Amino acid sequence: MAINVEPALSPHLVVDDAASAIDFYVKAFDAVELGRVPGPDGKLIHAALRINGFTVMLNDDVPQMCGGKSMTPTSLGGTPVTIHLTVTDVDAKFQRALNAGATVVTALEDQLWGDRYGVVADPFGHHWSLGQPVREVNMDEIQAAMSSQGDG
């Protein structure tokens, strides 16, 4: 029997406390837990969530699964990746994330590219941008706005 495979791109997050991270993502982003797999020591070696209609995977920091290195944002001194969520009612969703324990990285504001946009850091060091299109903007307008920002 053939298995139907849907191509997908899913972030796989490494965190210091996957069970707490799942609780946070449920509160902050209305995530739905799809499942979790604990390892012999009780750490989660795999978990999957549905956020904004897409799968996000995560696990506890298990260095032996990562070439012997700790791979959490806290152990690495930050994260070079921001996960973006396009949402409706971005003000409410941004505040919900803050109420759940996220901190502001970039304040929520209307941006020159047409989105109301801001960035939060979750308690585990991962960055999440939230945006909502609020006006249509073409590339020429964006480039003109960027050029005018350089004048001054």
UniProtKB/Swiss-Prot annotation:
It holds the Pfam family Glyoxalase. Residues 7-133 form the VOC domain. InterPro entries: Glyas_Bleomycin-R_OHBP_Dase (IPR029068), Glyas_Fos-R_dOase_dom (IPR004360), VOC (IPR037523). PANTHER family: BNAUNNG04460D PROTEIN-RELATED, VOC DOMAIN-CONTAINING PROTEIN. This is Uncharacterized protein Mb0911c. It comes from Mycobacterium bovis (strain ATCC BAA-935 / AF2122/97). The lineage of its organism: Bacteria, Bacillati, Actinomycetota, Actinomycetes, Mycobacteriales.
